[in-house]
Amino acid sequence: MYHVPVLLEESVSGLNIDPDGVYLDLTFGGGGHSREILKRLKDGCLIGFDQDSDALANVPDDSRFIFVNHNFRYLRNFLRYCGYDEADGILADLGVSSHEFDEAGRGFSFRFDAELDMRMNQRSRLKATDILNTYSEEDLTRIFRNYGEVDNVRRLVDLIMRARTEKMITRSEEFLQVIAPCVPKQKEKKYLAQVYQALRIEVNGELEALEDMLKEAERALRPGGRLVVITYHSLEDRIVKNFLKSGNFEGKVEKDFYGHVKRNFELVNRKVIVPSEEEIER
């Protein structure tokens, strides 16, 4: 089941839709954002991307819509393949879809006992269980520290390393039992969310794909085109903000001879747009 899209009106309005323009929905999912964009198109075209094959079931029967079952990091190649050199607007709603979280067998949530899979693209090989059972102590430390921002990372990794010498860690219930001694009692859900986030990001190469997508979007958009990105955690947010403000991922502001900041994007909204109280309650 796919839930109501986040910031639906704000994000689609942010694209400043030209009824005859070319638009990209890089995270099609349940198709909520795409359906709203299609309502505002006349003779334009919308290309929807989603690497998750489950999204195929939601593709609208609309001649103006083209579905691409691949990662959004290759957006320019597919834009050209569809017959277009430039796009008028690009929308990306990052992170995991509600469907992926709620499907127990996908392994994205610690609410269910399931195989630790966590692949957004079911055709890819690397699973979370591969990471837990084959990664070195150094690499496990890196992903939980950098992608999960876990405080007691050494204790966490030590528990995993010890457990896997006796038995492979393959399911959520097993994993939760292994790491239980280092989970803070008062912050259990937050801690587990950070741990699962770290594994998911590594499995799917999310941050690398995000950087590739932003560079591709910069080159694919026509002058005056719009890019709308919805982020959910500080790692995504930092990458997007740095790139849009400075033109690079380090956030280093470079200026030309006249003192003008060298970047290709002009910020339309200076302040962050957040969901309304009504939307949060839904």
Where are these regions (language model features)?
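S-adenosyl-L-methionine-dependent methyltransferase catalytic core, i.e., the SAM/SAH-binding region
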Residues: 1-282
